[in-house]
UniProtKB/Swiss-Prot annotation:
Acyltransferase in keyword set: no
Spans annotated as Disordered: 1-24
Protein name: Catalase-peroxidase
Gene: katG
UniProt organism field: Methanoregula boonei (strain DSM 21154 / JCM 14090 / 6A8)
Binding partners and assembly: Homodimer or homotetramer.
Length: 733
């Protein structure tokens, strides 16, 4: 007999049948996390493989959505009443926090896929009560369904919120495609407690690529560094975290002042009254968290950050009152009812000038956050703040532009923008590329140019490496980089160590000569951009290598790229794209705390590659000889320049014994197991394809007797994918 309380599967009432217990990654945490290369699988997507969000968005009645959002702003709900009778400030915070996770160093985070709906973001302390904002939006999302993504709706709600309170926004672009599970590739920090700050070392040096001061915060601690109410010290944190989100000092001041022109924070009582976050809340709460037992738990009794601050006398109307109040008073430290540090005017000044959010008969004194006072007491911020105070029109313009940048920074080029409110002005941070202004080359010209390239004296590795260097800057995280624009010939890319500047100049000079000669003599208005020619040269090199290896392949090439200018290229903005490691070229700039194989997986994930695509590209690039500095590490072949499966057959050969090279833990020597005769050298990136069980399984496919043709075809397909990663025009077609 089986007791009703006993699980019929495991025989134990306390056991779980899925996902519990020690995973293999718990047992062996140093193995590379290959799951990031298969996240967001079609199997997790309820929309199906044929769903085209861009086409659905074009069917959207955009004006109707905005009208519904505008009506929602003042339709206060009993279950979560609107502060001051207006939900605008709540939706501004929701949109800000959706976009504000973006960081420049790896392009991850941001609003681009609606990740605020999922853990960990949906349960971050800094996102307290934003679950209510999304539930308020659900009737509108339900009404318009697949025609607008959650990712777009959250940002649009923030825009409409601003407009409904009298602010003129810079514009809005749709095109953010929802994902359906949490991101696994984003490193949010190593801390295992909320608000932990192990991310700092030395003199408050923030760990890369993080852009927030503590675990679970979007940017900074509003009470000050580690809760210490020091406005000047807080300014240092503000400057660093906002810079890591691509904001300069002026944009930072505009965003803080503009955002804090509206609404309030919530700290009506002690945090001990607040229940668990959404992911830890009981099932009957249906995904809502932070249930409070303080009074009614809502409205005037709401507890959020623990701070109880209302910045201006007009919290639902755009004004310059934030700066007026900031500079009109001398401030003294106080505490909120929840015990959080905040500031109020000295000697009771300003009493009765600020409305209460839920009781029209009550009036309050102005209050400010420690980080608000940073705008007055940091000398650089103070100068900017006073300028905006004296020039409110310039504040409005700066805030509009900074808000647009904040909410669109991770969308990539303007070609991805959708909708009737896309601004006409091209902005430098959008990495602009000129529109095609000539007739594109066709099959005949492509064949002619391939012959010219292959007869130019450039080697196969030089052709392949240059194209790879150009295209592989692409980041699927924020859709930046790629071959379009030919920015590899411009600063800063032309000087990056990984691109071997001297070798690059030689290759580009030859290709530019071919380009100029062709463009002078071609008929019918046909021209070729250098961006196209660089990719075509790489494709020609792959084709030649395949031929040398005995394979007949067609390497896809589609023209349509254009050449950007140096004036269209923000050197500082592009500097963050410089690879510190590129395992595909066997390049490692220096020793890092993270292993070379983990850095390879990270690079592959940014290139949107699967584990098989990563594997086949490594194997092909090695035998072609496309390695940094012409190093022979990983070139496991006696026929370099020929596309063969030699990398895999030799790596998996049990006749080879590998040992680390003395003094270099990242390099290994492979010797004949019987004679001890040296055969090959390889890096950790090379050897992981024989050491890791999953990667070895893939490598075995390509090393098999019947695997060489599949290897050649798969390599060409993966190569073509990387060359076209930034061709959003092709994806739309």
């Amino acid at each position: 007999m089986t007791d009703d309380s006993t699980c019929p599967v495991t025989g134990g009432a306390d056991k779980q049948v899925t996902g519990r217990g020690q995973s293999y990654r718990d047992w062996w945490p140093n193995q590379p996390n290959l799951r990031v290369l298969s996240q967001h699988s079609p199997r997790s997507n309820p929309m199906g493989g044929e769903f085209n969000y861009a086409e659905e968005f074009k069917k959207l009645d955009f004006a109707a959505v905005k009208a519904d959002l505008r009506a929602l702003m003042t339709s206060s709900q009993e279950w979560w009443p609107a502060d001051f009778g207006h939900y605008g400030p709540l939706f501004i915070r929701m949109a800000w926090h959706s976009a504000g996770t973006y960081r420049t160093l790896d392009g991850r985070g941001g609003a681009g896929s609606g990740q605020q709906r999922f853990p960990p973001l949906n349960s971050w302390p800094d996102n307290v009560n934003l679950d209510k904002a999304r539930r308020l939006l659900w009737p509108i999302k339900k009404k318009y369904g697949r025609k607008i993504s959650w990712a777009d709706l959250m940002i649009l709600a923030g825009n409409v919120a601003l407009e409904s309170m009298g602010f003129e926004t810079f514009g809005f672009a749709g095109g953010r495609v929802d994902t359906w599970e949490p991101d696994e590739d984003v490193y949010w920090g190593s801390e295992n407690t909320w608000l932990g700050d192990k991310r700092y070392s030395g003199d408050r040096k923030l760990e890369n690529p993080l852009a927030a001061v503590q675990m679970g915060l979007i940017y900074v601690n509003p009470e000050g560094p580690n809760g210490k109410p020091d406005p000047v010290a807080a300014a240092k944190d503000i400057r660093e975290t906002f810079a890591r989100m691509a904001m300069n000092d002026e944009e930072t001041v505009a965003l803080i002042a503009g955002g804090h022109s509206f609404g309030k924070t919530h700290g009506a009582g002690p945090a001990s009254h607040v229940g668990p976050e959404p992911e830890a809340a009981p099932i009957e709460q249906q995904g809502l968290g932070w249930k409070s037992s303080f009074g009614t738990g809502k409205g005037g009794d709401a507890i959020g950050s623990g701070l109880e601050v209302t910045w201006t006398s007009t919290p639902t109307k755009w004004s310059n009152n934030f700066f007026r109040i900031l500079f009109s008073y001398e401030w003294e430290l106080t505490k909120s009812p929840a015990g959080a540090y905040q500031w109020q005017p000295k000697d009771g000044a300003g009493a009765g000038t600020i409305p209460d959010a839920h009781d029209k008969n009550k009036r309050r004194a102005p209050t400010m956050l420690t980080t608000d006072l940073s705008l007055r007491f940091d000398p650089v911020y103070e100068k900017i703040s006073r300028h905006f105070y004296e020039n409110p029109d310039q504040l409005a313009d700066a805030f509009a532009r900074a808000w647009f940048k904040l909410t669109h920074r991770d969308m990539g080029p303007r070609t991805r923008y959708l909708g009737p409110e896309v601004p006409k002005e091209a902005l430098i941070w959008q990495d602009p590329i000129p529109a095609v202004n000539h007739t594109l080359i066709g099959p005949r010209e492509i064949t002619f140019l391939k012959r010219k390239i292959l007869a130019s004296g450039l080697s196969i590795p030089e052709l392949v490496l240059t194209a790879w260097a150009s295209a592989s800057t692409f980041r699927g995280s924020d859709k930046r980089g790629g071959a379009n624009g030919a920015r590899i010939r411009l600063a800063p890319q032309k000087d990056w160590e990984v691109n071997e500047p001297a070798r690059l100049r030689k290759v580009l000079a030859v290709l530019e000569g071919i380009q100029q000669e062709f463009n002078k003599t071609a008929t019918g208005g046909k021209k070729v951009s250098l961006a196209d020619l660089i990719v075509l040269a790489g494709c020609a090199g792959v084709w030649k290598a395949a031929k040398n290896g005995g394979h007949k392949v067609t390497v896809p090439f589609t023209p349509g790229r254009m050449d950007a200018t140096q004036e269209q290229t923000d050197v500082n903005s592009f500097a963050v794209l410089e690879p510190k490691a590129d395992g595909f070229r066997n390049y490692l700039k220096g020793p890092y705390a993270v292993s070379a194989e983990e850095l390879l997986v990270d690079k592959a994930q940014l290139l949107t590659l699967s584990a098989p695509e990563m594997t086949v590209l490594i194997g092909g690039l090695r035998v072609i000889g496309a390695t940094y500095g012409q190093a022979t590490h990983g070139v496991f072949t006696t026929l370099p320049g020929a596309l063969t499966n030699d990398f895999f057959t030799h790596l998996l050969d049990m006749g080879t014994e590998w040992k680390p090279v003395a003094g270099n833990p990242d390099v290994f020597e492979g010797s004949d197991r019987k004679t001890g005769e040296p055969k090959w050298t390889g890096t950790r990136v090379d050897l992981i394809f024989g050491a890791n069980a999953q990667l070895r399984a893939i490598a075995e496919v390509y090393a098999s007797a019947d695997g060489e043709e599949k290897f050649a075809q798969d390599f060409v397909a993966a190569w073509a994918k990387v060359m076209n990663l930034d061709r959003f025009d092709l994806a739309q077609k």
